[in-house]
From Swiss-Prot:
Homodimer. It comes from Synechococcus sp. (strain RCC307). Signal peptide: none annotated. Catalyzes the conversion of dethiobiotin (DTB) to biotin by the insertion of a sulfur atom into dethiobiotin via a radical-based mechanism. This is Biotin synthase. One of its GO terms (molecular function) is iron ion binding. InterPro entries: Aldolase_TIM (IPR013785), BATS_dom (IPR010722), Biotin_synth/BioAB (IPR002684), Biotin_synthase (IPR024177), Elp3/MiaA/NifB-like_rSAM (IPR006638), rSAM (IPR007197). PANTHER family: BIOTIN SYNTHASE (PTHR22976), BIOTIN SYNTHASE, MITOCHONDRIAL (PTHR22976:SF2).
C-alpha cells in the first residue's frame, strides 16, 4: 500500500486539516483512502447488540446506562441476555447482510465467573457463524484479554470518547490512562482494536484534533475507528447539549481517514441526524463501515431498508472482505 503511515502527527497539523475548506479536505481524504484501498470501495456492515443493559457504575455524561443518571434505561431493571438469544440475533444480523457482530456489556470492567464464560461462548458462536466478533465491556485484565483472543475474538472496543483535555468534563470514574492501559492489554493479547470518540459534547475543534492525535499516535493504529455524534438522551447530564453540525462529523471522518489510512472508519452513533446526502459525504470522506440494524445499544439507528438505499444511492457495495482482520 502506498499510503503513508505516521504516528507523529503534530496537533497544529491536525487542526489545520480540520480547518481546511471542506472540498479540499474531502479531496485529500479521498486520495488517501484510494491509495490505501486500491482494490476498490467497500463498506463493511456491522451490527451492535446490548447484551447487558443498564446499571453501569461509570458516570459517563452522555450515557443513559449509567446508574448515576435518571434516563428511561436506568429506570428499568438490568437486562442480561443469554447465549442462545444473542447467537440468534447474530444469525439474524448475518442473514440481513451484516459482516461483523458487536456485543456490549454495561460494565466498568469484565466480571469473572458465569458472565465471562457466557461472553466467551458468545464470541465462539459468532465466529462459527463466519462473522467478525467485537466486544465492548469496559476494562479487562491480561488474562481476560488472552482468553478472549483464544475464543476467537476479532476486536476489543474501548473508546477514548474525547480529548485528554476535555475528558474530566465527561467522566470522573475512570481515568484516560486507564482507557489507554485497557487498549494496550487487548493489543498485547493479539486482539485488534476498535477505538474512537464522540463529537458534540461541548468540546472545541482543538479537542477534536487532540483526540485524533492520541488515536493516530497509537502504534499500530486502531484497526477500527468509530466516529460518533452525541445522541443527547433525556436524563443524562448532556440532555440539553446544543446539537452538533453534520458537516463537523464529515470533517472528523475525513481527518481520521487521513491520519489512519488503513483503519476502518466507522460511521456510528448519531447517524439518524444525518440526511442521506450528508452520509454520502461521510462515505466520500473515507467512512468504510456503518452500523447496520435498527438500534445501537440503547439508541435508535437508521432502518435496514434506509441503509440499503443509502449504499445504492452512493454506488458503493458492502463486502465480506477482511473478516477476522479488523
Amino acid at each position: 500500500m502506498s499510503a503513508l503511515i505516521r504516528h507523529d502527527w503534530d496537533l497544529a497539523e491536525i487542526e489545520a486539516l480540520l480547518e481546511l475548506p471542506l472540498v479540499d479536505l474531502l479531496w485529500h481524504a479521498q486520495q488517501v483512502h484510494r491509495d490505501a484501498h486500491p482494490a476498490g470501495y467497500h463498506v463493511q456492515l456491522a451490527s451492535l447488540l446490548s447484551v447487558k443493559t443498564g446499571g453501569c457504575e461509570e458516570d459517563c455524561a452522555y450515557c443513559p446506562q449509567s446508574m448515576h443518571h435518571s434516563s428511561d434505561v436506568t429506570a428499568q431493571p438490568e437486562l442480561q441476555l443469554q447465549v442462545d438469544g444473542v447467537l440468534q440475533q447474530a444469525r439474524s444480523a448475518r442473514d440481513a447482510g451484516a459482516h461483523r457482530f458487536c456485543m456490549g456489556w454495561a460494565w466498568r470492567e469484565i466480571r469473572e465467573g458465569a458472565p465471562f464464560d457466557a461472553m466467551l461462548a458468545m464470541v465462539r458462536g459468532v465466529r462459527e457463524l463466519g462473522m467478525e466478533a467485537c466486544v465492548t465491556a469496559g476494562m479487562l485484565t491480561d488474562s481476560q484479554a488472552e482468553r478472549l483472543a483464544q475464543a476467537g475474538l476479532t476486536s476489543y472496543n474501548h473508546n477514548l470518547d474525547t480529548s485528554p483535555e476535555h475528558y474530566d468534563q465527561i467522566i470522573s470514574t475512570r481515568t484516560y490512562q486507564e482507557r489507554l492501559d485497557t487498549l494496550q492489554r487487548a493489543r498485547d493479547a493479539g486482539l485488534s482494536l476498535c477505538c474512537g470518540g464522540i463529537i458534540g459534547m461541548g468540546e472545541s475543534r482543538r479537542d477534536r484534533a487532540s483526540l485524533l492525535q492520541v488515536l493516530a499516535g497509537l502504534n499500530p493504529h486502531p484497526e477500527s475507528v468509530p466516529i460518533n455524534g452525541l445522541v443527547a438522551v433525556e436524563g443524562t447530564p448532556l440532555e440539553d447539549q446544543e446539537p452538533w453540525e453534520p458537516l463537523e462529523l464529515v470533517r472528523m471522518v475525513a481527518v481520521a481517514r487521513i491520519l489512519m489510512p488503513e483503519a476502518r472508519v466507522r460511521l456510528s452513533a448519531g447517524r439518524e441526524r444525518l440526511s442521506q446526502e450528508a452520509q454520502i459525504l461521510c462515505l466520500l470522506a473515507g467512512a468504510d463501515s456503518i452500523f447496520y440494524g435498527d438500534s445501537l445499544l440503547t439508541t435508535s439507528n437508521p432502518a435496514v431498508q434506509a441503509d440499503q438505499a443509502l449504499l445504492a444511492a452512493a454506488g458503493v457495495s458492502s463486502s465480506l472482505e477482511g473478516v477476522a482482520a479488523a
